[in-house]
Amino acid sequence: MNLKKITALMIGAVMAVSMAVPAMADDKVETVTDGKLTVATSPDFAPYEFYSIDEDGNPSLAGFDMDLAKYIADKMGLELEVIPMDFDGVLSELSQKNVDLGMAGLSPDPAREDAMDFSDIYYEGGQSFVTVKDKADKFTKLEDANNKDYSIGAQTGSIQLDLANENTPDADIVSLPKVTDIITELLTGKMDGAFIETAVAESYQKNYPDLEIVCDVPYDTEGSAIGVAKGNEALLKAVNEAIAD
């Protein structure tokens, strides 16, 4: 699913609620809790998932992962339950089958395939190396970050952490549980650079113009998929059908 289709999904989310067709009885999908679709997410990953202030002034989950989760649940005739947690918690809960889906801008890394199944790609994105404007001239190319004098960040348990270890093994690599923590470290000068998913980096850059996206980071498996509880073929099929719509 490309970005244009994701945008259309967000605009049509309200329509999808009324138009959704519940799953037929003979196509019943087993879930962690009967009648519910339980989704784990890490709401520090705008524009995928984040906290937004609603009309009553209260924080509520938003983002196109959340719109997609709602669409899938409605299409299956299930109530949506979203459980926020750190990113590594999403991976852990899904691998233990405590939740049905993990939606947190997941990359379908082959190293994760023993712990979960992956849906089809629903958004094609990339990876970026990010710093602040005052330090941008230090990183004219990605190789410049591979220096023991630099502190380089990435989210704990993420593909970005793998990319940091692969591309900057000589640097002081720091893993933090939330992307918001990484952004804070960059802006306060405690961290020199970081590996961040491109759409996420662009989203933070809109709010924090001191951030600078220096370059793209090569990565073979570019794109985001939904993590599905391992072995639940019926659920995986239902998720892929929703993505294809």
Where do the model's predicted regions map?
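A ligand-binding cleft/hinge motif common to bilobed small-molecule-binding domains
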Residues: 88-89, 106-115, 162-166, 187-220
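Extracytoplasmic small-molecule ligand-binding "clamshell" domains
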Residues: 27-106
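Extended ligand-binding regions for polar small-molecule ligands
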Residues: 66-75, 133-135, 143, 149, ...
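Short helix-initiation/N-cap motifs at beta->coil->alpha
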Residues: 64-66, 81-93, 137, 174-188, ...
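Alpha-to-beta junction loops
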Residues: 77-79, 95-104, 149-151, 178, ...
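Ligand-binding cleft/hinge of the Venus flytrap
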Residues: 50-56, 69-77, 142, 159-177, ...
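Periplasmic-binding protein-like
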Residues: 124-133, 198, 202-243
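A conserved helix-loop-strand patch within extracytoplasmic ligand-binding domains
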Residues: 78, 89, 107-108, 119-161, ...
